[in-house]
Amino acid sequence: MQALEGIKVVDLSRALSGPFCSMVLADLGADVIKVESGPHGDMSRAWGPFDRGVSTYYLSCNRNKRGICVDFRQPAGLDVVRRLVAQADVVIENFKAGTMDAMGLGYAALSARDPRLVMGSVTAFGPRGPLRDWPGFDQIAQGYAGLMSLTGFPDGEPTRTGTAIGDLSSGMWVATGVMAALFERERTGRGQHVGTSLLESLVALLSVHGQRYLSLGDVPRRTGNAHAVIAPYGVFETADGPLNLAPITSDMWLRLCQLLDLPELPDDPRFATNDARVAHRDALKALLESRLRTRGKREWTQRFVDAGLPAGPINTLDEVFDDPQLAHCGLVEPVAHPTLGTLRQVVTPLGGMGDDVPAPRTRHAPPLLGEHTVDVLREAGYDDDAIDALLAGRTIFQADAVAEAVQ
């Protein structure tokens, strides 16, 4: 039995932050009902690249859910959503602040009917304050939170991270908050509304950079692939490409000098202390690379690791997914998809550390648009006549009818 088995989640979110949150809950055993607005569904379904017509963006964050398609614009459609929510333990949403209240689905209204309900929300800038009504996506928040000012090279422009870290981190924060709220509900019998924003999530991830400013008033700047306060640390060129090297202690620094046959460096005043090495990092990098360029990155990596020095290659994604370590981690699992056949996916990285601890597992693929509409409505208490009427009125959509409705 998985930790969240028996917990029912109604996921009203779209795009990435909310769906990622609910996928984490689904991977841990929750029964997640993904409710998409008909007839077109989650906006991410239109975002490429596509695998035989299916968005890989959508596939990345909707595993282990059952999917229904409802026209929210119709009163009967909202009634369907309200009935599903009334039977749920958790509701996830990432609408603009105030939208849920306007639909009659705000936490105050829902919790008045069911005090045990837990709601998890993600907004762009928070539910209060002067920016509560601002629209925002990941890159907008990365810039506003200062993250882009820290990312990139000193002589280059501010740079976004290579993945949607604001969306993903806010999803993880809310998943954590939902689980804490469910645990608290066991003690008090009451649910609660937990939430975060892209802005808050990214500011929380500033970590030492944020503390440096709050404590010292220093405004950190971009340092490229170098560490702001440790040297040597970062990317170094070898004979056949770059590798990462991070000898962060004094003992590691001495071992590095011995391994590279540079015994004079520790006595050089420019490199005798970490602060001195940071001040002269460019000169130090040139000296280290003069040795590193004599061998390839794989050979150097093995030599460094054998000497107890943290190092590793800088892989492309084909190298990542072909790496045997990934297979040992069990991070990629196959799942049967209704139209794509066998689909490989990266799973939630919470493998059990013992045989008696169940790891998250893939139960079913990301749903087709409206794949489980009829089944879910039957479970919710709708009889076949009512379901047929909703289908005929284009209030709900079942998978085999969605393509026709969109045309």
What are these regions (language model features)?
Residues 171-191, 204-216, 257-264:
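Oxidoreductase and adenylate-handling cofactor-binding alpha/beta cores
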Residues 336-389:
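Flexible, small-/acidic-enriched active-site or ligand-binding loops
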Residues 1-187, 368, 374-407:
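N-terminal helix-loop segment corresponding to the beta1-alpha1 unit
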